[in-house]
Regions:
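N-terminal intrinsically disordered/low-complexity leader segments
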Residues: 1-10
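Helix-turn-helix
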Residues: 14, 18-56, 60
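Hydrophobic alpha-helical connector segments
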Residues: 60, 74-100, 152-156, 175, ...
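Short, basic, alpha-helical segments at the C-terminal edge of helix-turn-helix-like DNA-binding modules
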Residues: 63-69
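Short alpha-helical scaffolding segments that buttress acidic/His motifs in well-ordered protein cores
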Residues: 90-91, 105-109, 156-160
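Amphipathic alpha-helical segments used for helix-helix packing
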Residues: 97-123
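Hydrophobic/aromatic-rich alpha-helical bundle segments in the mid-to-C-terminal region
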Residues: 119-123, 127, 139-189
């Protein structure tokens, strides 16, 4: 579902792509500027020329990934007649295909507890996604108040996050089963 296209010939973009890959594979604490430079195949001096600290680089990469995710998600939703279906399809796509993004999300959520910049970026993105879903519920089901639509969007996203955690932890997880449950939940949320 998500496509962040870093321009691979530009050293700055190679660095961002390497950071994204390492964050998703190893987690925040396990990476260093040296490891990022090695993964990007650039000299450490070149890395620090573009990005002074690991934190500033990670914050930038996370911000770009979340913006790309939201923009792609919003465009697909806005270009559809059945917006709730597109939302559920997007969640299903992440559950079936996007292991790197799932791991990145869990890493960023855990790191946001101690990094205020990441906390703000993640919180802003989270709010935008929840508002988009709530607006779709309100438009689809005209009887809903914004308060109820907001609650329904949170329940749907919470189900998706729970499924991502279960998938990562390999806790009795079946992608098809989870996707079906989320699809059914989305439909039931609209009926109430």
């Amino acid at each position: 579902m998500i496509s962040v296209n870093f321009h691979k010939k530009d050293p700055s973009e190679k660095i961002k792509e390497a950071t994204l890959n390492l964050l998703a594979e190893k987690g925040y604490e396990a990476i260093s500027m040296r490891k990022i430079a090695k993964e990007a195949n650039v000299a450490l001096g070149q890395l620090t020329y573009y990005y002074k600290t690991k934190d500033s680089l990670i914050v930038l990469v996370v911000k770009e990934v979340l913006e790309a995710f939201y923009n792609e998600f919003e465009e697909k939703v806005n270009n559809s007649d059945n917006k709730i279906e597109v939302i559920v399809d997007g969640i299903e796509s992440v559950l079936k295909e996007e292991t790197k993004i799932e791991r990145l999300l869990i890493t960023v959520i855990s790191q946001a507890q101690v990094n205020k910049k990441l906390q703000k970026i993640l919180g802003d993105s989270w709010s935008k996604i929840l508002n988009l879903i709530a607006t779709c519920y309100m438009n689809e089901y005209e009887k809903l108040t914004m308060e109820h639509a907001s609650l329904k969007s949170r329940l749907l996203v919470s189900s998706a996050i729970e499924s991502i955690v279960e998938k990562i932890l390999k806790v009795e997880f079946s992608t098809d089963n989870q996707a079906t449950l989320i699809r059914e939940a989305a439909e039931k949320l609209g009926e109430e």
